[in-house]
């Protein structure tokens, strides 16, 4: 059923922050199978649809956390079937926007949980879903707000699986247990414009900005840690608002981003960056403005018993030993980690957000097997059959 669920989910054009029927479809499906569900819409100007659904009323509560929203699909004519929101099956693969990020993992956990409930009437614990239509965007009224809401209602999650596409070369090779932080900067160096033939009557901000960027981009922030790669600064935009060749610009503006590990905080990095900027601007007798915003702090979890148990299930099911990682961008795991231990585990990440995003059907089966086996091992099923996928 996971392929059917995935094809149905691809059919909803759920561009951030719209559900466009995707969450409503899942809500109806889960209610049909005995889940207690609640759909909440948060936000005023951009309304975000969220779902919490739970089956059972005892501990432990194993929760799948995910998002139905997708990024724009680009030119539809570049897709195999010219319609990225109609699932296309070809040569053992399913194509469509959101296939790996992350409707495929939602489909797999849907199938695994419904099959588990059907096959096991004596389990101890609860299975739940927390889904949102805004993870790819601002993420203000999605998982973060829904977690606050359900905890205020008395719900508690004991362990979460975030279904982001984490695997690199094959299903099972990577489990994410943390994420890097992210901080964005906007620097405007303010000079005095003028004619290029009379530089003595102007103060060009560009030489100063070049020296600032040269120092910033050559800083070795750290050497990384056991689970984190080294922190990294990338320049993303430079603008002087000047297309004329004989005019010295008045202002030079640059945007840059730092992805940082747990050796830093947004505050310490901002202080370090501003010290460098201040020194150069004072030397060149220039003013500046600096704006920065951190969308996520870095975090890392110590692999506790439940995280290690999940890794063991992956290894037993797929005969591959997963590595713990913190690579990649930010995700809603940064909100979930404030409430419970978690793993991020899903499909391959290599086609996420790309034209002709796809997954192998065999990879869906592998992911389904891992999810199903984890439920079997965690929810105290007595007299259970051998784990799926094992030989």
Curated annotation (Swiss-Prot):
The keyword Hydrolase applies. One of its GO terms (molecular function) is succinyl-diaminopimelate desuccinylase activity. Pathway: Amino-acid biosynthesis; L-lysine biosynthesis via DAP pathway; LL-2,6-diaminopimelate from (S)-tetrahydrodipicolinate (succinylase route): step 3/3. GO terms for biological process: diaminopimelate biosynthetic process; L-arginine biosynthetic process; lysine biosynthetic process via diaminopimelate. Its cofactor is Zn(2+); Co(2+). Gene3D superfamilies: 3.30.70.360, Zn peptidases (3.40.630.10). Its EC number is 3.5.1.18. InterPro entries: ArgE/DapE_CS, Bact_exopeptidase_dim_dom, DapE_proteobac, Peptidase_M20, Peptidase_M20_dimer, Peptidase_M20A. Binds 2 Zn(2+) or Co(2+) ions per subunit. It is an enzyme of class 3 (hydrolase). Belongs to the peptidase M20A family. DapE subfamily. Homodimer. Catalyzes the hydrolysis of N-succinyl-L,L-diaminopimelic acid (SDAP), forming succinate and LL-2,6-diaminopimelate (DAP), an intermediate involved in the bacterial biosynthesis of lysine and meso-diaminopimelic acid, an essential component of bacterial cell walls. This is Succinyl-diaminopimelate desuccinylase. It comes from Rickettsia bellii (strain RML369-C).
């Amino acid at each position: 059923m996971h392929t059917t669920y995935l094809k149905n989910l691809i059919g909803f054009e759920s561009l951030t922050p719209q559900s466009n029927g995707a969450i409503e479809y899942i809500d109806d499906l889960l209610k049909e199978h005995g889940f207690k569900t609640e759909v909440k819409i948060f936000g005023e100007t951009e309304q975000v649809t969220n779902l919490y659904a739970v089956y059972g009323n005892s501990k432990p509560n194993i929760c799948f956390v995910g998002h139905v929203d997708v990024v724009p699909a680009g030119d539809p004519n570049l897709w195999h079937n010219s319609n990225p929101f109609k699932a296309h099956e070809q040569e053992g693969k399913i194509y469509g926007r959101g296939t790996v990020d992350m409707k495929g993992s939602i489909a797999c956990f849907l199938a695994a949980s419904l099959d588990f409930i059907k096959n096991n009437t004596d389990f101890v614990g609860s299975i739940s879903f927390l889904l949102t239509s805004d993870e790819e965007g601002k993420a203000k009224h999605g998982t973060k707000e829904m977690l606050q809401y359900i905890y205020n209602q008395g719900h508690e999650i004991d362990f979460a699986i975030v279904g982001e596409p984490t695997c690199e070369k094959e299903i099972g090779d990577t489990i994410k247990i943390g994420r890097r932080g992210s901080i964005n900067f906007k620097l405007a160096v303010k000079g005095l414009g003028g004619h290029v033939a009379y530089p003595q009557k102007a103060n060009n901000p560009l030489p100063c900005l070049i020296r600032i960027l040269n120092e910033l981009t050559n800083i070795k922030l750290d050497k990384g840690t056991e689970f984190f790669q080294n922190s990294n600064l990338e320049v993303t935009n430079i603008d002087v608002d000047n297309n004329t060749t004989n005019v010295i610009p008045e202002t030079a503006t640059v945007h840059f981003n730092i992805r940082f590990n747990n050796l830093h905080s947004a505050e310490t990095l901002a202080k370090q960056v501003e010290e460098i900027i201040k020194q150069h601007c004072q030397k060149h007798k220039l003013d500046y403005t600096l704006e920065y915003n951190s969308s996520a702090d870095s975090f890392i979890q110590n692999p506790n018993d439940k995280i290690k148990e999940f890794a063991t299930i992956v290894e037993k099911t797929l005969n591959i030993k997963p590595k713990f990682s913190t690579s990649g961008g930010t995700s809603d795991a940064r909100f979930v980690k404030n409430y419970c231990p978690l793993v991020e585990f899903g499909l391959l990440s290599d086609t996420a957000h790309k034209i002709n995003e796809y997954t192998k059907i065999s990879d869906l089966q592998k992911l389904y097997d891992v999810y199903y086996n984890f439920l079997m091992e965690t929810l105290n099923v007595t007299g259970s059959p051998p784990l799926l996928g094992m030989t």
